[in-house]
């Protein structure tokens, strides 16, 4: 083998691609001459002799693209791996595939290679495959076919071909080869290989790992730094500015995105809730009619308060107020120095990062829709747990919600589901900043597992929403209050000793004339009101009258059928009641049975109390198979009149599913289209049923179980509602009647209440008119409050005995108690009486002097008369503005449907109370 001859030639610097010019050698200032340089002329060899022979075959880089026409070019999209639900691409680029290779090479838009991946086994899925290239995910977009596109791709990729790995240092000068005639190289090596290192650019700002520039946390800088609120109050029309304490650094201003939609009572509500959750004392407002929501007051701290009870009536917008408060606390904080801020001093995060909303499962969808309606779910992350999830999936979702930031801020969960994920919440309870409990009266039972689970989370800021905070007694009231603000009422033993016992004694009818007990009870009541009004806000739906269409309330007294009267007599005779030992609890089964008779005698045979206590009677078959009743006749006549006389929809409400079954069969026989919602309907189907009824004009009626759906159930597609039977708890009926008269309603509303004349229906109605006294006393409903009657328990055993009496000779027992008018449709004005003065006189005479038996009997008769007068007075107050109408004397009931159907109903309606809306009054 012939070996090429070695020639010792001077070093020749490399030539730049595309350049034929060489720069002359310019010695550097630091060069050291160690030998004299020949004076011979320095020449440059333009021809570099390369010996023939074998050469080193270097491996080609992926950047060195072949010019082979068999190479295929693609456009690509790439991104970093992410777990987000809605993924986006971060960049575009190119991919190449050589015919002789099964490897795709990926480049970014600048032509820089960043990875490669093997082809998938299935060539048909080439464009659906997600490739892994380095730290990126890559997907092919389309293949380049046009010559212009391929040429453009080649140009982009060729930019980095010459220098795929650019060095960090560069040589500033090169030395051409020099030689003299002696052939001896005389350039010093130190000068030949001298390099100038390029210095890296130094940033003038300090390096940080944070994504945003934050304000230094040093105390010295904090004092010098000025902070500013998120919103400029000068650029907002009618802003809502929150109150603050002396330590606040910036104002908290409600986002105008929400603030512009809030009504005056909602603005006040948001500010009240904010004060409570921030632990601020209540301000002293001299004139409550002046709007103070546009000003920020500096208040003292109240260490006893960190929670709030919003007890507004249904329909006042408790959900919207809560969402406004949540959004405000997520975005803003008055303590700017404790969070990251922008360079201009604006807080970048709020006081709360994670908020837990607990509600009935039927309201989860409604809460999420409300967040989407008012904020748009792109602004705030709201997580709900799917009903299809397994328990493990729910637990994982809760863990991710608490630990992963910036994705979800609000978790909405049902009360029952809370128990299954309680362990995950307990482990990370320090991450939950706020708790919202909708329908908070569910937490009234101190032994409830749900209540104890929420207590174990130890969340400081709590907000409870309810329209019925006090339903039975002060024991339940204490449970709710102690959960909101622990310890504010002391221990239960001390609360019972100081408040429950004296207040209960004062309300006991046996102590109605004991001046000492009554005064002590009143004193304790006022003391408790002063404590609770610091964090309880209660408004009635009377303030909605100027925002909603007019509403006409009609109470119709329906004449019972002969079969019903017979059933009442047989049941009461068969029950063999001992009124001496009778209590409300022991007689509850009998009361329920009598209520069913009012609805339809056909419900008697299947009643458990009837089967176990009432034996077979001679006339059982004559009424147990009858479906007729006075209320059913009035109901079907009303439905037919609404369907024919108007284009409106109607909601029919009952407390019993068996009653709904009878009504549903009658509507089917009459060809009335309808839908139904009761406790048997799965929660996930309820929203679709309600939406279908509200939007589908072909659906005429909606059958509703009174206790189904929660307060968030809106049936504004209907403008007429018929309450077929009453519940002992007035809040249940009020909630049911508010389904149609709320935000979103465009038509005048008509509410019909059907009552069986002279029977237990009327007694329940009368009790409802008085049972609100406890809530009115402690929650501030002062408009309809009678201070004297609210101090007494207005029902005793005589009243309970009266429940089981049937008055067949009256047109309305309720009207007989309160009025002696002729029922000509006039509105009766009631003068103030000296009832309170008479009561005080009886108290003094019964406690300060010795009494003989004759005088005692006389006083007892006076007391009974006084009690009846008090009941009448209170019922009259509840029926203020109602017109008294006797159909035998007056055929105008301020409703065209009843008026047009009056010929058919004249023998079925014995009396009516009507409270007309504004439109009805104008028409008259």
From Swiss-Prot:
Query: Residues that bind ATP, according to the entry?
Result: 346-353
Where can the motif DEGH box be found? 472-475
Domain of life the protein comes from: Eukaryota
Report residues of the Glycyl lysine isopeptide (Lys-Gly) (interchain with G-Cter in ubiquitin) crosslink: 615
Which residue ranges are recorded for the region named Disordered?
A: 1-21, 155-182
Q: Where is the Helicase C-terminal domain?
A: 631-790
Q: Which reaction does it catalyse?
A: ATP + H2O = ADP + phosphate + H(+)
List, for all copies, the residue spans of the domain called Helicase ATP-binding. 299-487
GO annotation (BP), single: double-strand break repair via homologous recombination
InterPro entries, per the entry: Helicase_ATP-bd, Helicase_C-like, P-loop_NTPase, SNF2-like_sf, SNF2/RAD54-like_C, SNF2_N, SNF2_RAD54_helicase_repair
Compositional bias of type Low complexity: which residue ranges? 168-178
Name one matching Pfam family. Answer: Helicase_C
Q: What is its EC number?
A: 5.99.1.-, 3.6.4.12
Q: Where is the composition biased (Basic and acidic residues)?
A: 1-10
Subcellular location, record wording: Nucleus
Q: Which UniProt keywords apply?
A: ATP-binding, DNA damage, DNA recombination, DNA repair, DNA-binding, Helicase, Hydrolase, Isomerase, Isopeptide bond, Meiosis, Nucleotide-binding, Nucleus, Topoisomerase, Ubl conjugation
GO cellular component terms given for this protein: nucleus
Molecular-function annotations in GO: ATP binding; ATP hydrolysis activity; DNA binding; DNA topoisomerase activity; DNA translocase activity; helicase activity
- Similarity annotation: Belongs to the SNF2/RAD54 helicase family.
Q: Main role? A: Involved in the recombinational repair of double-strand breaks (DSB) in DNA during mitosis and meiosis. Has DNA dependent ATPase activity. Promotes D-loop (displacement loop) formation with RAD51 recombinase. Modifies the topology of double-stranded DNA during the D-loop reaction to facilitate the invasion of the homologous duplex molecule by the initiating single-stranded DNA substrate. Required for adaptation from G2/M checkpoint arrest induced by a double strand break, by participating in monitoring the extent of single-stranded DNA produced by resection of DNA ends.
Known partners and oligomeric status: Interacts with RAD51 and DMC1.
Q: What PANTHER family is this protein classified in?
A: DNA EXCISION REPAIR PROTEIN ERCC-6-RELATED, SNF2/RAD54 FAMILY MEMBER
The name on file for this protein is: DNA repair and recombination protein RDH54
Q: Which organism is it from?
A: Saccharomyces cerevisiae (strain AWRI1631)
